[in-house]
Swiss-Prot record:
GO-annotated biological processes: negative regulation of translational initiation
Name of the gene: EIF4EBP3
Localization in the cell: Cytoplasm; Nucleus
Motif TOS motif: positions: 96-100
Name by which UniProt lists this protein: Eukaryotic translation initiation factor 4E-binding protein 3
Organism this protein belongs to: Homo sapiens
Disordered as annotated region, ranges: 81-100
Impact upon substituting residue 45 to A: Loss of interaction with EIF4E
Keywords assigned: Cytoplasm, Nucleus, Phosphoprotein, Protein synthesis inhibitor, Translation regulation
PTM notes: Phosphorylated.
Annotated Gene Ontology cellular component terms: cytoplasm; eukaryotic translation initiation factor 4F complex; membrane; nucleus
């Protein structure tokens, strides 16, 4: 005969898990829109992380400098441009001279 044990139902929010699709061992459960159940083992997911395909970006990514492609100008050049802009600002002289 099999023996079973009971455990209390969690009462507070702090006792509930953050994600209902994972287990403490790292197994991930998912379903497709058609209802197919997919089980990903932790070991398999860690192996996929190091595969060459995972390190290759998708082909249709938009070109966003600094996000999907390297920045167009190094930060030092951007800082130089900001310094030039501050030097070219109009001085704070009185706009109108008034005789009192």
């Amino acid at each position: 005969m099999s023996t079973s044990t009971s455990c209390p139902i969690p009462g507070g929010r702090d006792q509930l898990p953050d994600c209902y699709s994972t287990t403490p061992g790292g197994t991930l459960y998912a379903t497709t829109p058609g209802g197919t159940r997919i089980i990903y083992d932790r070991k398999f997911l860690l192996e996929c992380k190091n595969s060459p395909i995972a390190r290759t970006p998708p082909c249709c990514l938009p070109q966003i400098p600094g996000v999907t492609t390297p920045p167009t100008a190094p930060l030092s050049k951007l800082e130089e441009l900001k310094e030039q802009e501050t030097e070219e600002e109009i001085p704070d002289d009185a706009q109108f001279e008034m005789d009192i």
